[in-house]
């Protein structure tokens, strides 16, 4: 896969390996609220980025078309758009096709063709689930069709991202005009890769999205692990592997967020050795079978899909992450101030323990009475 290099912005002179800001807000009752709330949270963390990337993931924003897959697309040219649409038309019924609404912003440069499609698969192979069919579509477009990139591909959700500061990206995409029940956001300070539109966060596959602060030093191993399951990493940044790993473990394998967290941020061997026998057997098996999925390096991530939001630190907690609750709201952010600016008096505020997830689940989707899980560190 190749991309038009002039749109890439070198960032080698701006390397600060501990920056980036993340924020997530969820209403566990499914009540939708304006995107302006998450924008206010991100604006407070402006200094955590350098203008080379920002973005938002929103859930519940297309209620009238909630049963259709929505592809948010980025194109380099009209020819790239034509080539991608020919492929999409061969495999999907296009119910609606339109530009992603934007407004002019003086700080947003090198704007690409931004389009969205509401789709229904035409034919699903017998040996493939509908979700796997959509994943294969995304992999093909990102890898094989030059100048075309799928920003998001889930139902009743979308990713909006680009090169700029969070407030400018929000203004450009008119985020204040959308309402959703889960919002996540990212302010980028690129460390090892270039700042470009496709490399901004969130990263997504189906309705899964990930925003990430840190550095995945195990990217090469994680990438090879994922390739064995049909995932292709083409977007030139380490965070891409996290999106595919959560799709693999939580959707395809059916693992819980808690178990998935213990694969991605596995306990140290010295801690496993001290566990009770049954627990020790479980974590030993996870390490032995899924060692290629272990995320090495400092990280703080927020993962979301249509039913849940999860915050997770690396197993030593080398990046900040704070959580809070207020009534039916769950907040997760890099800084407590980014929570208090939109929720001045939360019911509870805590710093999650290293490697222990904070999980919020929609009340309508939960299987038990547990709506929120996570330990205070």
UniProtKB/Swiss-Prot annotation:
CDD domains: GlxB. It comes from the Bacteria. Residues 20-377 form the Glutamine amidotransferase type-2 domain. The active site is at 20 (for gatase activity). Keywords: Glutamine amidotransferase. The keyword Hydrolase does not apply. Pfam families: GATase_2. This is Uncharacterized protein TM_0398.
């Amino acid at each position: 896969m190749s991309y038009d290099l002039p749109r890439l912005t070198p960032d080698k002179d701006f390397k600060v390996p501990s920056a980036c800001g993340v924020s997530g807000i969820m209403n566990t009752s499914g009540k939708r609220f304006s995107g302006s709330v998450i924008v206010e949270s991100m604006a407070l963390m402006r200094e955590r980025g350098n203008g080379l990337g920002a973005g938002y993931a929103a859930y519940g924003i297309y209620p009238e078309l909630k049963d259709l897959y929505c592809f948010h697309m980025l194109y380099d040219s009209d020819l790239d758009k034509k080539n991608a649409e020919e492929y999409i038309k061969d495999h999907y019924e296009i119910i609606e096709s339109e530009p992603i609404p934007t407004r002019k912003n003086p700080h947003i440069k090198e704007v690409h063709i931004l389009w969205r499609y509401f789709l229904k698969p035409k034919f699903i192979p017998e040996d493939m689930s509908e979700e796997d069919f959509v994943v294969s579509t995304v992999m093909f477009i990102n890898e094989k069709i030059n100048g075309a990139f799928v920003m998001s591909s889930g139902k009743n959700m979308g990713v909006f991202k680009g090169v700029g500061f969070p407030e400018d990206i929000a203004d450009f995409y008119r985020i204040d005009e959308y309402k959703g029940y889960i919002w996540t956001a990212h302010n980028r300070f690129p460390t090892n890769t270039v700042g470009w539109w496709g490399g901004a966060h969130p990263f997504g596959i189906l309705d899964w999205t990930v925003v990430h602060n840190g550095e995945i030093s195990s990217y090469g191993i994680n990438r090879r692990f994922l390739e064995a399951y049909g995932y292709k990493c083409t977007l030139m940044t380490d965070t891409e592997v996290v999106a595919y790993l959560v799709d693999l473990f939580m959707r395809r394998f059916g693992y819980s967020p808690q178990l998935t967290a213990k694969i991605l941020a596995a306990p140290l061997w010295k801690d496993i050795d001290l566990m009770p026998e049954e627990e020790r057997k479980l974590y030993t098996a996870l390490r032995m079978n899924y060692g290629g999925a272990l995320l090495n390096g400092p990280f703080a991530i927020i993962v979301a899909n249509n039913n849940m939001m999860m915050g997770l630190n690396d197993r030593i907690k080398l990046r900040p992450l704070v959580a809070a609750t207020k009534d039916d709201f769950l907040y997760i952010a890099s800084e407590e101030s980014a929570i208090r600016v939109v929720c001045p008096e939360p019911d509870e505020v805590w710093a999650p323990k290293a490697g222990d997830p904070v999980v919020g689940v929609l009340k309508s989707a939960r299987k038990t009475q547990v709506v929120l899980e996570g330990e205070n560190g």
